């Protein structure tokens, strides 16, 4: 499986199917890929309703005919926006789509959708585990540190994508603790240096992770890793 860090929290998984997580392109100052450069997208996963995560879901799902996976409330919102291939889930649920398996995991954050100045309830935020081609990728979404992450060690994660930017999510210290609890084979930091409020040094994070014998890769926007 090829995992590409598009920028911010947007990640592309390419294998037997193509999966796009939190597709934020328009307005993303660090996005290293344009929407027109994407391959065919089979699945879009939205971890929560904030604009930098739900992003361009509607436009891309209509373009590719993608199945969109999110929580129940966001799913209803997207259906009202004209999407008919929406699969709703909730935290703790796992579903086998035949070619991929998806599980939503707890995240501690918000999930409101803001539209024309109005706040729309977006259910509970989530992280997600995607299983494809005998590999498991965990995308934490936006979250603070939580003891629930200890349970993720039972999932035998191949690659964890964790936010390190602080302010709205875990900072480097908390992301390090999370990584110890998750115990993945490899970790990649995300959700940092997009705006001044979430400045962080990914090399500092990887330096801490090196102490616990877990591989850490800093991916610049547009770079990929094979797992």
Where are these regions (language model features)?
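Zn-dependent metallo-beta-lactamase
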Residues: 1-20, 25-29, 96-103, 204-212, ...
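Active-site neighborhood of phospho(di)ester-bond hydrolases with catalytic His/Asp-centered motifs
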Residues: 20-23, 41-49, 69-72, 138-141, ...
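Pre-active-site segment of Zn-dependent metallo-hydrolases
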Residues: 12-50, 55-62, 73, 110-120, ...
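Glycine/small-residue-rich loop that forms an oxyanion/phosphate-binding "nest" at active or ligand-binding sites
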Residues: 55-113
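Active-site-proximal loop/helix segments of hydrolase catalytic cores
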Residues: 117-180
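Binuclear metal-ion centers of metallo-dependent hydrolases, dominated by the metallo-beta-lactamase
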Residues: 79-93, 176, 180-227
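Active-site environment of divalent metal-dependent phosphoester hydrolases
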Residues: 27-28, 50-55, 75-78, 93-96, ...
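Short active-site oxyanion
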Residues: 1, 62-67, 135-137
């Amino acid at each position: 499986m090829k995992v590409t860090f598009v920028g911010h929290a947007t990640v592309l998984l390419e294998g037997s199917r193509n999966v796009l997580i939190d597709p934020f392109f328009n307005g993303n100052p660090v996005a290293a890929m344009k929407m027109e450069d994407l391959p065919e997208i089979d699945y879009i996963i939205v971890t929560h309703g904030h604009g930098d995560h739900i992003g361009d879901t509607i436009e891309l799902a209509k373009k590719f005919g993608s199945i969109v996976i999110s929580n129940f409330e966001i799913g209803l919102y997207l259906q009202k926006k004209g999407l008919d291939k929406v699969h709703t889930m909730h935290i703790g649920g796992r579903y086998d789509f035949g070619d991929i398996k998806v599980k939503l995991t707890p995240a501690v954050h918000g999930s409101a959708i803001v539209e024309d100045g109005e706040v729309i309830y977006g259910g509970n935020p989530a992280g997600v585990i995607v299983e494809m081609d005998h590999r498991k990728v965990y995308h934490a979404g936006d979250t603070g540190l939580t003891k629930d992450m200890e349970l993720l060690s039972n999932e035998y994660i191949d690659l964890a994508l964790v936010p390190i930017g602080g302010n709205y999510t875990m900072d480097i210290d908390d992301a390090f603790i999370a990584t110890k609890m998750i115990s993945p084979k490899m970790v990649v930091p995300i959700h940092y240096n997009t705006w001044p409020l979430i400045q962080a040094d990914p090399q500092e994070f990887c330096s801490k992770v090196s102490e616990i014998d877990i591989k850490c890769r800093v991916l610049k926007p547009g770079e990929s890793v094979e797992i």
